[in-house]
A protein has these predicted regions:
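Alpha/beta catalytic cores of nucleotide-metabolism and tRNA/nucleoside-modifying enzymes
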Residues: 1-4, 9-138
């Protein structure tokens, strides 16, 4: 296995895997989450930004994590950007827990998508689509 230490941005992982790296470790998803930076398929979202203070949408409506997706239980709706913004601004521990959960889910899903693209022989096409989406912005 080829190991790359301390690299953690989604784009860095995609490029490293594209170039043959097999293993990573990095604190970036959790550290960024604690500081209010969330990863989405359309780019990074800085939840502390005032524009999210009344935004009722989930972080990423296509994300299936427990933070973004209400799932089958309508009594447990997703956590809105406004609520996450509020938690981060008042330094409530739940804010860091929820944002960390989302970012880790994002990374696990990203790596799952890459594994599937490798198995299907479509990694190059998947990589282009990944960059196209990330450049849209949130």
């Amino acid at each position: 296995p080829r190991y790359l230490m301390g690299v953690g941005k989604p784009e860095d992982l995609v490029e490293a895997i594209f170039n043959g790296v097999d293993m990573f470790d990095c604190v970036l998803p959790t550290r960024n989450a604690r500081n209010g930076l969330l990863f989405t398929q359309f780019g990074d979202l800085k939840i502390r930004n005032t524009r999210y203070s009344s935004d009722k949408r989930p972080v990423d409506k296509s994300c299936k994590c427990p933070v973004c997706n209400e799932g089958d239980n309508s009594d447990q709706p997703y956590y809105s950007r406004a609520y996450l913004h509020h938690l981060q601004k008042i330094n409530e521990m739940l804010g860091s827990i929820l944002t960390t959960s989302h970012n880790l889910w994002f990374y696990l899903d990203l790596l799952k998508q890459i594994r599937e693209a490798i198995k299907a022989g479509t990694l190059k096409k998947w990589r282009k689509n990944f960059y196209d989406k990330r450049s849209i912005g949130v």
